Each structure stands twice: as C-alpha cells, then as structure tokens.
C-alpha cells in the first residue's frame, strides 16, 4: 500500500491550518511542514495537531525567498525520508473534501500512476491541479508567485474523482493592498525573466492581481500583453473574458464591450461564460431580444469537463435565470413561466434564489391571466 507524505510551507496560518490538516488526515502517513517566518501560533498548532493524531512529522524553519524556492526546499527535506511514496502539496487554506464512498485503503492500494490531478473549487470556479505525485519523479516548482509544478513529459497521470479541494483563499479574503503587493512582485519578476512561457504566465497573473486590486486599467493592459504572447487557449480565453468584464464595469462603449465578449467566446466557443455575461449585459441595457438570444445559445452548451476556471453555477442555473428574465422582457410570458418551472426544479438552484424565481413565475402567470 502506497504511503503519502504531506508537504507544506506555512506562515501565520494558525487560524486556518487546523481545518486543512483535519481534512487531509485520512490520507497522510507523514508530514513535512516548513514555517517561513510565522509570528503567531502556527508552529504550536502544527506540533500539537500531529502529536494528538500520532502522525510522524518534521517541522522546519526556513527564510522566505519566494514560493517556488521555498516549496522546492521543503521537498528537498521530504526526500530525506525513504518511506514516502507520494508527496501531497497543499496550501494552508486548502480543504480536502472526500466523496461519501471514498475508501482510503483501497485508494492507496490501487495507486500506480505518477501524478494524480484533483479538481479545485475556488471563488465559484473550478480547475484541475496536480496534488499527488510520485516521490522519485523529479517534479519541481517554478514561479516566484503563482508557482506551478513542472512534471516530466513521460509521467503517467490520473484524475482523482474520490476527492476534490476547496480553496478558501478567494478574492474576498484579501484586501486590495495585498493584491497590489503581489503585482509589484510580478512586475519585478517580469523585469528579470527571459523565458517566453514564464513571461506569458507572469502577464496573466499580473492582470489577475491588478484586477483584484481594483486597478482595472493596468489589469486590462496586462491581460492584453498576455494575449499577445499567444499559447494556451484557456488562459487566452480567461484573459479576454476578464478584459470584457472590466470594460463593462468601466462603462466602455456598448459596441466595444460586446466585441470584447465575442472575442473571448471565439477563442473557446465551448465555454458559456461570455454568453451568460452578454445576456446579463443586454438585459441591463434593455435589449431583451439580444438577452434571450445569448442566454438561449448558452443553454445549449454542456459544462466542459476540463478547463480553466469553469464557473459551475452559470451552467447549472444562471443561464436559465437570464433566459427567464429575457423571455419576460420580450413579452413571451408563457415561455418565461415554462423556463421558470424548469429553474425551480433545478437541484443546484440555491435557496437564496428560489424566492426570486417564485416571484418571476407569479409575475409571468399574472401577465398570462390578464391577456
């Protein structure tokens, strides 16, 4: 049966760390935790937790340099252990969520792939991330910030369905100054970097940092720089989608906003996020027939099984919500009521939205009765 070692770098994570460790406890046989300069109770929390649960562990202290350097150093310490078959790398604000049918012994007995990718849910979006990899595979991290795992081309990979990760480090958990600080780190990295791939990646995350820091004009410029680099279509799609959303937020001319959304959609026509946004944008501008067209087209698309930052709610109920409103705005109350009935049958519809859906259904019904 394969053994799994948890590898983490932490700093000032006392308030969130125990939740992460509790969630991953069923999987791990050993833990290597590297503290990079905490001035809170992080180290005490780690030591107490693993002693309480009788998990073999080592706690190291390291000077902070950057994310990839410190993660690679932590993995070097892990390599001192000869009894760990797989490394599992998590952040302190990750939570492992197991399916009800998960059998840890069966899972470990059947482990044979080099790398296991898990779905990550963060801030309403989903993507995949390698979370388990074979100890002797030679993986390492790159990137001063928003680091990523470099995996040998010959590695065999498998997508884990028995568990996924919930990341609690969404934009709302950090203030704007923190994101602008990240942007400063990335700007410095861009001045030093020469690798075209890393340059494209840094431009992408520079756009993300400025956007979340509230500097939309700099974010748009950074995302355009990412688009000019070419490459991975999913990253190009997200860059163009973010540009369109910020243009709408900054009240750019209507034709520019619509063109920006269409440009994003043309890169990944299997993605419905631009169509949802276009439907909502058209509704707000009282173009109800346009809204109906965009929402209807979006509803024809299945949620992709793989992709970068897939917005799950758009595919499960939000497009249908927009279609309800658009049909009503077009005066097609029968169609609006029928769509509303379908919406209320959706298990994914949050309780907070059901009242609004009921009101929409009542309004459509009253309109039909008055005809």
Q: Where are each of the predicted segments found?
A:
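Short, well-formed alpha-helical segments that are part of the catalytic scaffolds
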Residues: 7-30
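A conserved acidic beta->alpha catalytic loop
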Residues: 23, 27, 33-46, 63-64, ...
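Conserved donor nucleotide-binding strand/loop of the catalytic core
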Residues: 47-77
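Catalytic-site signature of metal-activated, phosphate-bearing donor transferases
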Residues: 68-76, 86-89, 94-221, 225, ...
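Short coil turns that delineate tetratricopeptide repeat
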Residues: 194-197, 231-234, 269, 303, ...
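"A position-specific structural signal for the A-helix of alpha-solenoid helical repeats
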Residues: 205, 242, 277-280, 319-322, ...
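Residue at a conserved register position within TPR or TPR-like alpha-solenoid repeats
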Residues: 210, 247-248, 282, 327, ...
């Amino acid at each position: 049966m394969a053994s799994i070692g948890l590898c983490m770098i932490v700093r000032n994570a006392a308030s969130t760390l125990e939740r992460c460790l509790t969630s991953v406890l069923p999987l791990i046989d050993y833990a290597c935790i590297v503290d990079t300069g905490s001035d809170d109770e992080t180290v005490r929390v780690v030591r107490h937790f693993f002693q309480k649960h009788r998990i073999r562990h080592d706690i190291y202290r390291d000077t902070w340099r950057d994310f990839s350097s410190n993660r690679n150093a932590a993995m070097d310490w892990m390599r001192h252990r000869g009894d760990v078959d797989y490394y599992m790398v998590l952040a302190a604000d990750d939570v492992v969520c197991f399916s009800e049918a998960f059998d840890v012994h069966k899972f470990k007995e059947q482990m044979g792939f080099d790398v296991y990718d898990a779905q990550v849910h963060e801030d309403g979006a989903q993507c995949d991330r390698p979370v388990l990899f074979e100890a002797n595979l030679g993986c390492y991290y790159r990137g001063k910030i928003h680091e990523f795992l470099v995996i040998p081309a010959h590695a065999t990979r498998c997508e884990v369905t028995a568990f996924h990760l919930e990341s609690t480090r969404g934009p709302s958990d950090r203030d704007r100054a923190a994101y602008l600080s990240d942007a400063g780190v990335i700007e410095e990295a861009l001045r030093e970097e020469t690798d075209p791939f890393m340059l494209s990646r840094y431009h992408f995350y520079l756009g993300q940092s400025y956007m979340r820091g509230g500097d939309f004009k700099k974010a748009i410029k950074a995302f355009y720089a990412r688009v000019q680099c070419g490459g991975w279509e999913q990253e190009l799609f997200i860059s163009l989608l973010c540009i369109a959303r910020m243009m709408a937020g900054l009240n750019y001319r209507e034709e520019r906003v619509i063109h920006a959304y269409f440009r994003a959609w043309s890169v990944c026509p299997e993605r419905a996020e631009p169509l949802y946004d276009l439907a909502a944008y058209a509704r707000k501008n009282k173009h109800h027939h346009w809204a109906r067209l965009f929402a209807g087209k979006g509803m024809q698309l299945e949620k992709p099984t793989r992709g970068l930052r897939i917005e799950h709610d758009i595919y499960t109920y939000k497009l249908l919500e927009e279609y309800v409103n658009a049909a009503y705005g077009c005066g097609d109350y029968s169609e609006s009521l029928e769509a509303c009935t379908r919406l209320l049958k959706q298990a994914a519809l949050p309780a907070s939205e059901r009242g609004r859906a009921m009101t929409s259904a009542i309004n459509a019904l009253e309109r039909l009765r008055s005809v």
